[in-house]
Swiss-Prot record:
Protein name in the entry: Elongation factor 4
Keyword Protein biosynthesis attributed: yes
Naturally occurring in which organism (per UniProt): Hamiltonella defensa subsp. Acyrthosiphon pisum (strain 5AT)
Family, per entry: Belongs to the TRAFAC class translation factor GTPase superfamily. Classic translation factor GTPase family. LepA subfamily.
UniProt entry keywords in alphabetical sequence: Cell membrane, GTP-binding, Hydrolase, Membrane, Nucleotide-binding, Protein biosynthesis
Cellular component GO terms held in the UniProt record: plasma membrane
Catalysed reaction equations from the record: GTP + H2O = GDP + phosphate + H(+)
Name of a matching Pfam family: LepA_C
Subcellular location: Cell membrane
tr-type G domain location: 2-184
Keyword Protein biosynthesis: yes
GO process annotations (BP): positive regulation of translation
């Protein structure tokens, strides 16, 4: 037990966490030179393309320290993006310590801070590491002061390294072995294993990543899932080196994977505890706090035949991504699909892309919305995640929107631009603190404004230097309205949106004008209207196609022409009464993209 170390790396995006993990794996001989690909732990194609870590990965390595002992290092990689903070908290729950990696040129960023506080709350030992010291712009002394000033941990003897060139990697490992405590636990006690992550393998069924807190686990043991009471036989056990490597036993304090031939996708939920069926533990381990999705959107398969495979794909994906929420939804315009909850827009994009790539589905997404709290006239409280579920205006006493507390860290020279952006997003300043060259801003901004494009706009106004961390603060009464889109007085449920009354007219007008370009002309006029309740705020008309019924009349009496025109007019009237306006698929897609561009 004394020669085991469980740790993870916390860092902001692009501070060199994946490169550092590559070097550590290389130094400990986890992979041969030939097998060593850069960013070896970012195994998903998407991760490599975007250059971000999405899923937490784990590796077991052996390191011969200078004191002559060989240490077993169980290392869990974590994502750095704000949308995947839940993955980080899960990884940290399995560790005793964390390496806080900070770019020696850029300094501390908001996300690093948030993840570092999560680690300190869990009583983990945090070891600061200054990376990228080979860059000409690096200033390790200033950044060390910044870490002490902003994060509040002692960084006077922070390890300095360059993951790219390999300088100082051995020092990082020595410090890790020295400062991070060995795991606590009773090897002879009853088995308690925490499920950190699960994924679905077509051949093996559910594969779970586990951390043994107490006891040992052997191949052939019968284990019980404590939340469901189900009993399974352990068929395979092992560790990642980062390749999957089979072993016969997992000891106390180790991190490994296990296969129990669980075919039911919900058989072993993440955050659950496994114990032996013959000597069950008295109580489960404290799991993870459930995360609430912040953004909701409808996902619909383009072909209705794909509905079943879409449902299976979502179930398999939610096993691997515990923060994804979904429930069936039926839309008059788009048919059957699912209402899905995500942690943010990047999370939504990644999920949609994974569904399309890994499960070969073609999907349509409706515009994303946040959850609103509604107080009805009958004093009931409802939570609404879709505009179509919002009660009529006459039944609503108060509509409250979610407010996010945003912590923004940025260099002083961009302060003016960022404050202007926050005000434009209906933000209220709460706090402002200067740390040397950096400024820490705290704003309360409506969640709907934050999740849509605030992150991108913040990056562009500050040339990429500002960083953001946000969390849900409270619901606050606000003058929000639902804007409905009507086609020939018929409401189209999938196009409704909830917005602030001040922006309603402009958003409605914009949407109506854009739709006019995408709806094909019919034999009768099509009125496209945007309405709040019964009040029409914008309108556009798609003009009718008209057949020339007088073409066959050569001269002749005017009453004959009038009769033909009158007949055509009545026909058009009848057609308009019974005619349906079909919305083409690309009109939907275009409308949703327009919403994103214009905000």
């Amino acid at each position: 037990m004394n020669y085991k170390r469980n740790f993870s790396i916390i860092a902001h995006i692009d501070h060199g966490k994946s490169t550092l993990s590559d070097r550590i794996i290389q130094l400990c001989g986890g992979l041969t030179e030939r097998e060593m690909a850069s960013q070896v732990l970012d195994s998903m194609d998407l991760e490599r393309e975007r250059g971000i870590t999405i899923k937490a990965q784990s590796v077991t390595l052996y390191y011969q320290a200078q004191d002559g002992n060989t240490y077993q290092l169980n290392f869990i990689d974590t994502p750095g993006h704000v949308d995947f903070s839940y993955e980080v908290s899960r990884s940290l729950a399995a560790c005793e310590g964390a390496l806080l990696v900070v770019d020696a040129a850029q300094g501390v960023e908001a996300q690093t801070l948030a993840n570092c506080y999560t680690a300190l709350e869990m009583n983990l030992e945090v070891v600061p590491v200054l990376n990228k010291i080979d860059l000409p712009a690096s200033d390790p002394d200033r950044i060390a002061e910044e870490i002490e000033d902003i994060v509040g941990i002692d960084a006077t003897d922070a390890v300095r390294c360059s993951a790219k060139t390999g300088i100082g990697i051995a020092d990082v490992l020595e410090r890790l072995v020295r400062d991070i405590p060995a795991p606590k636990g009773d090897p002879k006690g009853t088995l308690q294993a925490l499920i950190i992550d699960s994924w679905f393998d077509n051949y093996l069924g559910v594969v779970s990543l586990i951390r043994l807190k107490n006891g040992t686990l052997r191949k052939g043991d019968k284990v019980k899932v404590m939340s469901t009471g189900q009993i399974y036989n352990v068929e395979r056990l092992g560790i990642f080196t980062p390749k999957r490597f089979d072993t016969d036993i997992l000891n106390c304090g180790e991190v490994g994977w296990l296969v129990c031939a669980i075919k039911d996708i919900l058989g072993a939920p993440v955050g659950d505890t496994l114990t032996l069926s013959r000597h069950p533990a008295e109580k489960p381990l404290p799991g993870f706090k459930k995360v609430k999705p912040q953004v909701y959107a409808g996902l619909f398969p383009i072909s209705s035949d794909d509905y079943e495979s879409f449902r299976d794909a979502l179930a398999k994906l939610s096993l691997n991504d515990a923060s994804l929420f979904f429930e069936p939804e039926n839309s008059g315009a788009l048919g059957f699909g699912f209402r899905c909850g995500f942690l943010g827009l990047l999370h939504m994009e990644i999920v949609q892309e994974r569904l399309e790539r890994e499960y070969h589905l073609d999907l349509i997404t409706t515009a994303p919305t946040v959850v609103y709290e509604v107080k009805t006239v009958k004093k009931e409280i409802l939570y609404v995640d879709s505009p179509s579920k919002l009660p009529a205006l006459s039944e609503i006493e108060e509509l409250r929107e979610p407010i996010a507390e945003c912590h923004i860290l940025l260099p002083q020279e961009y302060l003016g631009n960022v404050m202007t952006l926050c005000v434009a997003k209906r933000g209220v300043q709460v706090n402002m603190v200067y740390h040397g060259h950096q400024v820490a801003l705290t704003y309360h901004i409506p969640m709907a404004e934050v999740v849509l494009d605030f992150f991108d706009r913040l990056k562009s106004t500050s040339r990429g230097y500002a960083s953001l961390d946000y969390n849900f603060k409270r619901f606050q009464a606000s003058d929000m309205v639902r804007v409905d889109i009507l086609l020939n007085t018929e409401r189209v449920d999938a196009l409704a949106l909830i917005t602030h009354r001040d922006n309603a007219a402009s958003r409605g007008r914009e949407l109506v004008e854009k739709m006019k370009d995408f709806i094909p002309r019919q034999q009768f006029d099509i009125a496209i209207q945007a309405a709040i309740g019964h009040h029409i705020i914008a309108r556009a008309t798609v003009k009718q196609l008209r057949k020339n019924v007088l073409a066959k009349c050569y001269g002749g009496d005017v009453s004959r022409k009038k009769k033909l025109l009158q007949k055509q007019k009545e026909g058009k009237k009848r057609m308009k009464r019974v005619g349906n306006v079909e919305l083409p698929q690309d009109a939907f897609l275009a409308i949703l993209h327009i919403g994103k561009e214009s905000k």
